[in-house]
Amino acid sequence: MGACLTLSFSCDEVVNQISQGLCINVGYICELSKNVVAMKKDMEVLKKKRDDVKRRVDIEEFTRRRERLSQVQGWLTNVSTVENKFNELLTTNDAELQRLCLFGFCSKNVKMSYLYGKRVVLMLKEIESLSSQGDFDTVTLATPIARIEEMPIQPTIVGQETMLERVWTRLTEDGDEIVGLYGMGGVGKTTLLTRINNKFSEKCSGFGVVIWVVVSKSPDIHRIQGDIGKRLDLGGEEWDNVNENQRALDIYNVLGKQKFVLLLDDIWEKVNLEVLGVPYPSRQNGCKVVFTTRSRDVCGRMRVDDPMEVSCLEPNEAWELFQMKVGENTLKGHPDIPELARKVAGKCCGLPLALNVIGETMACKRMVQEWRNAIDVLSSYAAEFPGMEQILPILKYSYDNLNKEQVKPCFLYCSLFPEDYRMEKERLIDYWICEGFIDENESRERALSQGYEIIGILVRACLLLEEAINKEQVKMHDVVREMALWIASDLGEHKERCIVQVGVGLREVPKVKNWSSVRRMSLMENEIEILSGSPECLELTTLFLQKNDSLLHISDEFFRCIPMLVVLDLSGNSSLRKLPNQISKLVSLRYLDLSWTYIKRLPVGLQELKKLRYLRLDYMKRLKSISGISNISSLRKLQLLQSKMSLDMSLVEELQLLEHLEVLNISIKSSLVVEKLLNAPRLVKCLQILVLRGVQEESSGVLTLPDMDNLNKVIIRKCGMCEIKIERKTLSLSSNRSPKTQFLHNLSTVHISSCDGLKDLTWLLFAPNLTSLEVLDSELVEGIINQEKAMTMSGIIPFQKLESLRLHNLAMLRSIYWQPLSFPCLKTIHITKCPELRKLPLDSEIAIRDEELVIKYQEEEWLERVEWDNEATRLRFLPFFKFFGPEWQVSYVR
């Protein structure tokens, strides 16, 4: 064993010697542990600072329409890079620390420890540098306002292309400053507005900003200003707390410096742009406002004279949309499904909301039975169909928004009629008066005015649809009708309160669990044969039984326990020949319609109905007598048109005993009766519709008409008079006044046919509100207005309200009027078989509504013979002539 050698030296000296020899920084090794701890600590500080900065950036970008500064983004990127490098260093940290020896002052692998220590020191410096750079006073910069923010929209849209282009033309070419889009709920107004919004991003329109705001019911000015403010980068916590006046000023200052488009979706009342701070659009500032609403009234209050209606889809478009929603696989699931699917789609009547919801509901139904059941449910009580909870409440908003409570029951009443049923406005008003919706103690004129106002409200709210051809009729969209029935049954809770089973093939009155709860019942257009039994309908006020062609018999007991019945309509029951005397038990009855029945005599019990106000007896081809009618003391309106029995001398006497009579619509076949009626001032005042058929004048051949302020319609067929004149005393002059020139101021419709003695209709000068004139098959008529006769009545310009003129088979007709007329309301002229009529009273200078005018003719040779005052007139009106071939037939008024 050899001797030991002991050497004594310090570790520092060894390391120093090595470092001097290698020219390295020994601190990388000696201070590695300390530097790693410092690096970790500083990195945690940096990450917290990074998180704080990022949070500030996110908040400002999200809530205040700002964009992060480039230096902030660069710093965040650098921090991310450093963090990755830091994490990489930490992966070998434990191994490097284990490599140290001599209490951390030396390393088992000096080179490796040196290099790692150097990286730690450099990382520490980089972290410290980034941390010092991360103290930002501001982290974002306000961004320029985006010109347009595109809205999400469903990929499949059907049937809006034409409407979209029309609206776009209004905005960009026609110069309309405010465009109103109105239509019923679920028709696609919001979708259309969304497409308009997105179209601005496709087109270079020159607008600085396009703003979208959803308004909804009960507009919240503060919220709407807030939505506009956010779009204009005015929003923020501080601005949110500013009062509305200051916010309006801020909005005005921004919008007043640029062209803008404001899109307001779903407005229910006038939106005051001034209160919002929105400059009013004008041609000078070039700004636009487009809004959607369910009410045409709102369009008027927004100062839009010509709003654009968004209508339901056409049948082919509706079917296309429905197919998309159902899917090809389902439609091909069975050969019968496509035909059934068309019927289901038809129940939606082109309403996109219903087509979408019902189509999606049926998308997985691949059994024929499921489709048949769907048709059955939609036909009987659609509210129970799956998905209707997504449709009916949306439509109900329009009902809820009816401000007058009086209007709501009138609307619900319209649901008693069949689908797509055309309701006569005045008949509807008569129902409402009898039901008590309109005060029956008002004068007839005032009650009618209220009724027409209610109809107008419902039409403008898109809850009723006005007929395009016959303005005196309205109808209800089928889905809106289902909504009304749902409401009438207390949202489905009390279905028996309002029973409507129309056109479903009933052969008897339906079974009802609780007759005492029934208030209204409509069984129109069925096949009921007998009304028997004695149902205790103590609350029933309305019973519609129209057009049950098989109805033969009503038992004596049927009316015994219906004491509250107000309206009974039995019209159109062509097999019904008798009414029971027990009708006298209907002590509350105010309205009775027996038109188009085969009843020969009115029951004696009818005379006991002391509250009966309205009695209609039209087209009763076997009616022989209504004697005793004077005993119906409360009668206010009697209608006896085109029945076997017409007005006779004794009936004139009876009618004069009816003290409360206000309206008389009557047919007459005798000249003596005409004379007697026209000499009964109180009855003349009641005349509203006068039909003369087969009246042959027995004296002078002149029909002299007195002043008839309420006369609305005149039909003269196969009569022998050679002239119609106005009573002389009507035209007499007083010492201070000129002749009266408007003694038929309510007359709107005149139909004359097969009157071979008449040569002219100059008396029509005194009908200033005439809208429809038909003259047919009268071989001696030479002119509508005779110039010589008219010259004695200077200052009267005829036909200022005329909309429709029909002239047919008038062999001698040479002139309508001897000089051009303005015809400001004229829409259609029908001329057939009038070979001598060579000239129409038209002139190129008159302001006629030529965008609607149609001039129909049937003979090409007639058009070739038409004479024009000048070439300008010919060029203007020739495009409005439309040829109708021999298949076109003239329709005659019954």
Curated annotation (Swiss-Prot):
The UniProt gene name for this protein comes to SUMM2
Alphabetic keyword roster: ATP-binding, Coiled coil, Leucine-rich repeat, Nucleotide-binding, Plant defense, Repeat
Provide the organism lineage as a comma list.
Eukaryota, Viridiplantae, Streptophyta, Embryophyta, Tracheophyta
- Listed name of the protein: Disease resistance protein SUMM2
Q: Does the keyword ATP-binding apply?
A: yes
Organism of this sequence: Arabidopsis thaliana
The record's Gene Ontology biological-process terms are:
defense response
According to the UniProt entry, the coiled-coil residues are 31-71
Q: What does this protein do?
A: Disease resistance protein that mediates defense responses against the bacterial pathogen Pseudomonas syringae pv tomato strain DC3000, and the virulent oomycete Hyaloperonospora arabidopsidis isolate Noco2. Becomes active when the MEKK1-MKK1-MKK2-MPK4 kinase cascade is disrupted by the microbial effector hopAI1. Does not seem to be required for the activation of MPK4 by flg22, or flg22-induced up-regulation of PAD3. Functions downstream of MEKK2/SUMM1 in immune responses, including cell death and defense responses.
Could you say which residues bind ATP here?
183-190
